[in-house]
């Protein structure tokens, strides 16, 4: 056991424990050893590293996350000792070998993940094993339940509704219409959403343009009691913490294993107390799911898992072959959603159609509309301003103020991208549009993004504006323009594709 003086490191490496190389040599420890750092009864597990210059002898360097968990400050004395190897490592290897895991083995993996006993390398091995070997529904059910149980569980009375999209399509701001439509019909819909992970704007990023999203459970219950709905950031709550841990290793690997996709969605809904759920599965070129067949298979798995969890779930397969609406980026999307709530006849058809279709399904699930008539009721609530009024109630209850679409500010710098030829828009790349919007600064720069002047099938002439890039940074705008010229995300083709001559 070593007694060392704390030195706080301003770095974001959660498992790092740094000591002087001479201290390491004179101890029984080796680089990459798993150690327990202890202070006044609190313990954190870390991976040991050494340095000859960054840390003096007798010191221990700890990153901010570890400092916060231990409750230490600069100069405090902590102890380090050898940590036992995680019990779940053999189970991770078992899944790497392609074998089925028992419920208890899955519980151990999730527990040790949440307790900080697994390193990112070990978690990456587990995530990769799921990507390669998958899981059956018994395993997925066990993983979902444990992911929910390791965090906060919210209890409600009566039916609690929610809608969730698996994502992958830019501009998917449907929740800002669906939540107030459903809430205005008297159904309770506490919507928790994520911030952007790989997109230009998550639902929470868009709503945050208008109001607070970092509400506590107590605040959420108050808002829902007052308004029937809310739109908040799930990351501010301790819901299914293992989900956020796995996402952090999925992102750099660029993978999204289906077992984790299913568990991620359902664990958070289970933890939030949802018992009536609609899953949106965008499908098409450039979406996560490419075909109706693939989407139907995923939908059946969501429904089977939901049945096991006693959550009544329906799935909607929606068109995801191009962005939803015309706006991509937090402020631009908030502005477009508000416009749809103010006067839906002036808003993009794709946004309105998707929103009232999804809301209609929820209204039918809630028994406030007969089967087949939910969409009509949803459109009526939108047209009569009921959804707009309810949206403003929710925004104010969450700490914001009433605002109109023309009051939303977007980036002060902008650039129009023009069509190089006459023709028709034959394809819009979801990935390309997202990359350009992010290069412009979205989602961190809430005023950055893209506004599409055209959609697939539109006729254009040479020189017409295809889309406009917005940013609050002149440099970021220039960078986005350069990327736009490389990616060419909107494809325009003439009716004559090629001429074949006799010779």
Swiss-Prot record:
Q: Name one GO molecular function term.
A: pentosyltransferase activity
Q: Which family does it belong to?
A: Belongs to the thymidine/pyrimidine-nucleoside phosphorylase family. Type 2 subfamily.
Residue positions of the active site: 256
Residue ranges the record marks as coiled coil: none
Q: Which reactions appear under catalytic activity for this entry?
A: AMP + phosphate = alpha-D-ribose 1,5-bisphosphate + adenine; CMP + phosphate = cytosine + alpha-D-ribose 1,5-bisphosphate; UMP + phosphate = alpha-D-ribose 1,5-bisphosphate + uracil
Outline what the protein does.
Catalyzes the conversion of AMP and phosphate to adenine and ribose 1,5-bisphosphate (R15P). Exhibits phosphorylase activity toward CMP and UMP in addition to AMP. Functions in an archaeal AMP degradation pathway, together with R15P isomerase and RubisCO.
**Can you tell which superkingdom this protein's organism belongs to?**
Archaea
Q: Which NCBIfam families match?
A: AMP_phos, ARCH_P_rylase, PRK04350.1
Enzyme superclass (EC): transferase
Tell me what this protein is called.
Answer: AMP phosphorylase
Q: Which InterPro entries does the record cross-reference, listed alphabetically?
A: AMP_phosphorylase, Glycosyl_Trfase_fam3, Glycosyl_Trfase_fam3_N_dom, Glycosyl_Trfase_fam3_N_dom_sf, Nuc_phospho_transferase, PYNP-like_C_sf, PYNP_C, Pyrmidine_PPase_CS
Q: Which GO terms describe its cellular component?
A: cytosol
- From which organism does this entry originate? Methanocaldococcus jannaschii (strain ATCC 43067 / DSM 2661 / JAL-1 / JCM 10045 / NBRC 100440)
The UniProt keywords, alphabetically, are: Glycosyltransferase, Transferase
Q: Which PROSITE patterns match?
A: THYMID_PHOSPHORYLASE
Q: What is its EC number?
A: 2.4.2.57
Q: GO biological process: any one?
A: pyrimidine deoxyribonucleoside metabolic process
The keyword Glycosyltransferase is annotated on this UniProt entry:
yes
**Per the record's keyword annotation, is Repeat included, yes or no?**
no
| Residues annotated to bind AMP | 168, 194-199, 203, 264, 288
């Amino acid at each position: 056991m070593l007694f060392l003086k704390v030195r706080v490191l301003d770095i974001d490496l959660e498992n790092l424990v740094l000591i002087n190389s001479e201290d390491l040599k004179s101890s029984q420890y080796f680089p990459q050893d798993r150690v327990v750092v202890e202070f006044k009864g609190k313990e954190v597990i870390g991976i040991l590293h050494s340095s000859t210059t960054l840390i003096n002898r007798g010191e221990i360097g700890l990153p901010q996350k570890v400092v916060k968990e231990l409750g230490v400050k600069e100069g405090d004395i902590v102890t380090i000792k050898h940590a036992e190897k995680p019990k779940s490592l053999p189970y991770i290897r078992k899944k790497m070998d392609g074998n089925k895991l028992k419920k208890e083995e899955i519980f151990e993996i999730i527990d040790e993940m949440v307790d900080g006993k697994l390193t990112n390398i070990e978690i990456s091995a587990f995530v990769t094993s799921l990507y390669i070997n998958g899981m059956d529904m018994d395993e997925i059910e066990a993983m979902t339940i444990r992911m929910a149980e390791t965090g906060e569980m919210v209890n409600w009375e009566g039916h609690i509704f929610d809608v969730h999209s698996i994502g992958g399509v830019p501009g998917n701001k449907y929740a800002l219409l669906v939540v107030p439509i459903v809430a205005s019909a008297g159904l309770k819909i506490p919507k928790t959403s994520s911030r952007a992970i790989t997109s230009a704007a998550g639902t929470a990023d868009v709503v945050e343009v208008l109001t607070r999203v970092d509400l506590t459970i107590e605040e959420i219950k108050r808002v829902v009691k007052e308004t029937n709905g809310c739109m908040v950031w799930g990351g501010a709550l301790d819901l299914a913490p293992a989900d956020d841990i796995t996402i952090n290793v999925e992102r750099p690997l660029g993978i999204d294993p289906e077992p984790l996709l299913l568990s991620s969605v359902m664990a958070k809904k289970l933890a939030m107390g949802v018992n009536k759920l609609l899953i949106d599965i965008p499908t098409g070129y450039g979406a996560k799911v490419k075909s109706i067949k693939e989407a139907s298979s995923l939908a059946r798995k969501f429904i089977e898992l939901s049945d096991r969890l006693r959550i009544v779930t329906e799935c909607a397969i929606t068109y995801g072959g191009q962005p939803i609406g015309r706006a991509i980026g937090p402020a631009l999307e908030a502005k477009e959603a508000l416009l749809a709530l103010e006067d839906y006849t002036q808003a993009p058809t794709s946004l309105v159609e998707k929103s009232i279709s999804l809301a209609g399904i929820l209204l039918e699930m809630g028994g406030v509309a007969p089967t087949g008539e939910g969409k009509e009721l949803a459109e009526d609530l939108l047209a009569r301003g009921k959804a707009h009024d309810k949206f403003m109630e929710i925004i104010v209850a969450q700490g914001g103020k009433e605002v109109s679409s023309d009051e939303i500010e977007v980036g002060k710098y902008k650039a129009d991208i023009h069509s190089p030829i006459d023709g028709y828009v034959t394809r819009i790349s979801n990935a390309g549009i997202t990359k350009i919007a992010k290069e412009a600064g979205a989602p961190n720069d809430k005023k950055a993004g893209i506004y599409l002047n055209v959609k697939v099938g539109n006729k254009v002439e040479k020189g017409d504006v295809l889309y406009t890039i917005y940013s609050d940074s002149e440099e970021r705008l220039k960078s986005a323009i350069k990327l736009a010229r490389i990616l060419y995300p909107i494809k325009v083709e003439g009716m004559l594709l090629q001429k074949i001559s006799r010779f």
